[in-house]
């Protein structure tokens, strides 16, 4: 499962999405998160699905690779689906076994919410797959620039969020290594009662925290060795340039939002 985690990883490429301004991608994610909540029927979710598939194809990232990244969250999606089936009692009963009843409203809502979750995960994952940590930092810093008037450390906030994203796959790899080392010593993480499996995770947490702090210290030393002193006076090797392609992407999102609004039930 740890090998399936792709959030935070960068896949080099020359696709249209790779070449977009990072600010465009960050704005796109923010708008998409808002747009997703406009969907409330088959037509709107189908339109969102077509948009998501279109974006995935433009990145040229193998679809099988993205599906592999969904494995860690498949249980959350299934739990969400089952929760809506059990808790939503709307519409006619379409299936019944004893006291267990499945209502049409519960089934529909379960499918819709699960699709919404998958769409959001796919689109947000594409940010790190097509954008380097430096580009994410620069993009966030530019978008948060107005907050400098409030004396907020914009560069430091952007850098902190970028490092957090970058460290997700690193921590997953460390967790995988520690789990394999513990399993070689006879620890079983996959079988037995839930209580026993929870106990087995405790010895995993201590070395993981130690490793995380060690890596954070190494990163801090490396930044100091390179003369990093915050955002003030920092120069950039590449400046962000907004092009017509970026404007077209934002316009297409606005059109998508308008279509979803008119297709709403």
UniProtKB/Swiss-Prot annotation:
Its main location: membrane. Keywords: Cell membrane, Membrane, Transmembrane, Transmembrane helix, Transport. It is a multi-pass membrane protein. GO terms for cellular component: plasma membrane. It is found in: Cell membrane. InterPro entries: ABC/ECF_trnsptr_transmembrane (IPR003339), EcfT (IPR024919). Disruption phenotype: Abolishes riboflavin uptake, cell growth less inhibited by roseoflavin, a toxic riboflavin analog. The chain crosses the membrane at residues 29-49, 50-70, 73-93, 107-127, 152-172, 243-263. One of its GO terms (molecular function) is transmembrane transporter activity. Pfam families: CbiQ. Forms a stable energy-coupling factor (ECF) transporter complex composed of 2 membrane-embedded substrate-binding proteins (S component), 2 ATP-binding proteins (A component) and 2 transmembrane proteins (T component). May be able to interact with more than 1 S component at a time. Belongs to the energy-coupling factor EcfT family. HAMAP family: EcfT. Transmembrane (T) component of an energy-coupling factor (ECF) ABC-transporter complex. Unlike classic ABC transporters this ECF transporter provides the energy necessary to transport a number of different substrates. Involved in riboflavin transport. PANTHER family: PROTEIN ABCI12, CHLOROPLASTIC (PTHR33514:SF13). This is Energy-coupling factor transporter transmembrane protein EcfT. It comes from Bacillus subtilis (strain 168).
């Amino acid at each position: 499962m740890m090998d399936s985690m792709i959030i935070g990883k960068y896949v080099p490429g020359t696709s249209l999405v790779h070449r977009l301004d990072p600010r465009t991608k960050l704005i796109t994610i923010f708008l998409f998160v808002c747009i997703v909540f406009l969907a409330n029927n088959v037509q709107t979710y189908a339109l969102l699905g077509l948009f998501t598939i279109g974006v995935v194809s433009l990145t040229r990232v193998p679809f099988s690779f993205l599906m592999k990244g969904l494995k860690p969250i498949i249980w959350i999606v299934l739990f969400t689906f089952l929760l809506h089936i059990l808790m939503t009692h709307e519409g006619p009963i379409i299936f019944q076994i004893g006291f267990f009843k499945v209502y049409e409203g519960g089934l529909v809502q379960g499918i819709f919410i699960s699709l919404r979750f998958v769409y959001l995960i796919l689109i947000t994952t594409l940010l790190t797959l097509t954008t380097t940590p430096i580009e994410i930092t620069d993009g966030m810093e530019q978008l948060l620039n107005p907050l400098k008037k409030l004396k907020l450390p914009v560069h430091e906030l952007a850098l902190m969020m970028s490092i957090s994203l970058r460290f997700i796959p690193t921590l997953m790899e460390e967790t995988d290594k520690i789990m394999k080392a513990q399993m070689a010593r006879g620890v079983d993480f996959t079988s037995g009662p839930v209580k026993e499996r929870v106990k087995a995770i405790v010895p995993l947490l201590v070395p993981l925290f130690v490793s995380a702090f060690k890596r954070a210290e190494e990163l801090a030393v490396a930044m100091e060795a390179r003369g990093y002193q915050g955002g003030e006076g920092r120069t950039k090797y590449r400046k962000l340039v907004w092009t017509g392609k970026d404007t077209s992407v934002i316009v297409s999102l606005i059109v998508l939002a308008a279509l979803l609004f008119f297709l709403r039930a």
